[in-house]
Amino acid sequence: MKHLLSMADLEKDELFEILKLAEKLKEERYKGVVTDYLKNKSLAMIFELPSTRTRVSFEVAMTDLGGHALYLGWDELQLGRGEPIKDTARVLSRYVHAVMMRVREHSTIEEFARYSTVPVINGLSNLEHPCQVIADLLTIYEYRGDFKDVTLAWVGDGNNVCNSMILAAALTGMKMVISTPENYDPNPEIVKKAEEMGAKLRFVRDPKEAVKEADVIYTDVWTSMGQEAEKEARLKAFQPYQVSDELLKFSKDDVVVMHCLPAHRGEEITDEVMEGKHSIVFDQAENRLHAQKAILLKLLGKESEVY
């Protein structure tokens, strides 16, 4: 694995190595172990879109690992004034040891990676969000102990996180039921690829049907960054897909609820569910830190130093 742009960049063994490594790093942090696995290493973080969790978790990850992270806003770089992506990629490759990017278009990060001589990490694009989903898998594993008997119901928009989770289902053997309104389905090319990889996917329009056998219910915002003009239409289309106490009545008693945050409480998820006994949302958010530490070590060839 040279870069992490998509969940499809991972082999099954690589994914499980990252999850195992993340568990170990989490344990070390809770014990207060001081590490310097990435001493004298620098990560450039390029943000075309704003972030709370991605920025903080990557910065803290590099600090915890003994390295350094540089925040680079899109408009602070010459990229914002028209410098070609390939030039920026070549230059930054001479300065830093890895680059994380949070961008509008997936094609941007693909082009950057083509010209970069250091690992490039997708911190979010319009197509995928692999860092989020690796953290999600760590969380599911902590709660369920395995993936083979887990059914995850995706309720809401077939967005970038959904796309990455579909590929993750293929890699882990987890079953996935996807419930979206018409015209808001996940990317068909990703669905096809996942099915070719052996993914066990089922598509249903009725969210009540989708959650019946679910061990995990996952939702995300109905209106993502850049879709503000569609907000009214989306609110109308997605209203039946709200994750509420009423919807949970149709699921298992021990179901857990996930959301990658930020949440629009009262839209895709109610306040009661966010704060309720089924929610593992904040454990999930914490795991961004541990998962991304593992991703960084794996890409920089330092994972063997942990054991």
From Swiss-Prot:
Q: Which positions bind L-ornithine?
A: N160, D220, S224, M225
Entry's EC annotation: 2.1.3.3
Q: Name one GO biological process term.
A: arginine biosynthetic process via ornithine
The Gene Ontology CC terms held by the record are:
cytoplasm
Enumerate the catalysed reactions: carbamoyl phosphate + L-ornithine = L-citrulline + phosphate + H(+)
Q: Which InterPro entries match?
A: Asp/Orn_carbamoyltranf_P-bd, Asp/Orn_carbamoylTrfase, Asp/Orn_carbamoylTrfase_sf, Asp_carbamoyltransf_Asp/Orn-bd, Orn/put_carbamltrans, OTCase_ArgI
Determine if Amino-acid biosynthesis is one of this entry's keywords: yes
Which EC class heads this enzyme's classification? transferase
Residues annotated as binding carbamoyl phosphate: S51, T52, R53, T54, Q78, R102, H129, P130, C131, Q132, C260, L261, R288
Give coiled-coil spans as residue ranges.
none
- What GO molecular function annotations does the UniProt record carry, in alphabetical order? amino acid binding; ornithine carbamoyltransferase activity
Where located? Cytoplasm
Name the pathway it acts in.
Answer: Amino-acid biosynthesis; L-arginine biosynthesis; L-arginine from L-ornithine and carbamoyl phosphate: step 1/3
Entry keywords, A to Z: Amino-acid biosynthesis, Arginine biosynthesis, Cytoplasm, Transferase
Which family does the UniProt entry place this protein in? Belongs to the aspartate/ornithine carbamoyltransferase superfamily. OTCase family.
NCBIfam families per UniProt: orni_carb_tr, PRK00779.1
Q: What does this protein do?
A: Reversibly catalyzes the transfer of the carbamoyl group from carbamoyl phosphate (CP) to the N(epsilon) atom of ornithine (ORN) to produce L-citrulline.
Protein name per UniProt: Ornithine carbamoyltransferase
Please tell me the species this chain comes from: Archaeoglobus fulgidus (strain ATCC 49558 / DSM 4304 / JCM 9628 / NBRC 100126 / VC-16)
Q: What is the lineage of its organism?
A: Archaea, Methanobacteriati, Methanobacteriota, Archaeoglobi, Archaeoglobales
- List the gene name: argF
